[in-house]
């Protein structure tokens, strides 16, 4: 109802047509499609690569003498290593994670490893530790940074820019390209997402001895910091990373890579979406095949077909094979267990309802009630027969066998390609249904966010409700009430002016037209505030950015903006416009994914 009211109200005023900002046109990638296709076929990614290496986090600065760590109510001077880790915890006192038992246990265990023997003898209980002064110190320091004089802020900005110029660019095949993340991640406490079993563990400081440098043989090898050396220097032109190291908590690789707005990254983005577009030509055949395989006498073939159905219709990931206990108990399609699935009896006119409940990537809970095809439901019943809750649902299937099957169906096909294809198709179809040409830009942006939300729900891109949500909604509601009062007042003034005009029989004077314009302006402002409130409420538990950046072909959004007169700035911020600069030239208003 609110959207209908907004549409009716917004028809009274129209907005100027969309234009691609001139500053963005100049940044559009000049490489043509044929050139990209040629480079995509080669395993050689570059011939020259030169850079300065990563920028390392500065050494720890000890706490001032007036800031104390207290144990059992008494000040205790810590060694530098133990004090640094204590500050990590102190900075986070205001966060909910520090109240979680897993976080506290992991932190205390890792903290004790950094203590001296004497400190370990004295500090035996986290409950007796008082980090209040440390927490207060960092709050005050943050506030001091916020209130710095303009001259000092400008000086800090210039220092950051100098650092960016020195470490934030590389030379790739004769071209200066921006680097995305040239700084190593600072040490701290691991938080993870969801209820991660390793939350609270110490993220160690990355040292040059941990880092592998990748550059061309004929380039100048970056100098490590004084007194240090690189773990290794190699020249591998089949990869696009500049430096790499292993993050010890999850034993995963971290990379220094090019900025998303760089030409090579743009080419990779384009290739990703072109592979997903190729799926459009064979997806009907693939679906017909896995539906036929639901009836196969071979258990493995039936499990493969049902798994592929889940990947296609529910955007599930395949699920990486990992050793037990290595990471959180996160699962994907192949690693689903019987305990993650519930088959519901017919109820309320609904049949073949399946409930899935498990921890997905980044420990984000996936919980969904979905109506499936009858044969899928029956196959799931067979897969679950005579199994314990902890047994694999797809016991005849492995991640590697599923991935190989996907490659056999189409070169380059992965679960991510399916997710990209279905996400982009969903956005395109939802925009077609929700967008009306006569609507205002405000209503069109609201429609776009609703289409984006449909994709986020499909991909299970959730987030916790922001802690500031209620407060910000109350503030927004007050603004709406104030604006409604202003609209009502302006309506009364306009009606009074109309009455005066009729009594005098005059033509519309300047004052009347001013009141009329004021009312229209206030109504437009009210419409925008109401749309913003609706948008915030509907998206409070949905993360729209992940799909927009990683799974939605930007040409769909740019074409929609051009077709319906929506400024691209309403959909993509400056950084995102730079990242998708390659798409501006390729997306006419008639582009179809």
From Swiss-Prot:
Q: Which residues form the active site?
A: 551
Query: Where's the transit peptide located?
Result: 1-43
Q: Name the SUPFAM superfamilies for this protein.
A: DNA breaking-rejoining enzymes, Eukaryotic DNA topoisomerase I, dispensable insert domain, Eukaryotic DNA topoisomerase I, N-terminal DNA-binding fragment
- Recite the UniProt keywords alphabetically: DNA-binding, Isomerase, Mitochondrion, Topoisomerase, Transit peptide
Q: Which CDD domains match?
A: Topo_IB_C (cd00659), Topoisomer_IB_N_htopoI_like (cd03488)
Q: Name one GO cellular component term.
A: nucleoplasm
Q: Give the main localization category.
A: mitochondrion
Q: Which Cys residues form disulphide pairs?
A: none
Role this protein plays: Releases the supercoiling and torsional tension of DNA introduced during duplication of mitochondrial DNA by transiently cleaving and rejoining one strand of the DNA duplex. Introduces a single-strand break via transesterification at a target site in duplex DNA. The scissile phosphodiester is attacked by the catalytic tyrosine of the enzyme, resulting in the formation of a DNA-(3'-phosphotyrosyl)-enzyme intermediate and the expulsion of a 5'-OH DNA strand. The free DNA strand then rotates around the intact phosphodiester bond on the opposing strand, thus removing DNA supercoils.
Name of the protein described by the UniProt record: DNA topoisomerase I, mitochondrial
The source organism is Mus musculus (Mouse)
Its taxonomic placement starts with: Eukaryota, Metazoa, Chordata, Craniata, Vertebrata
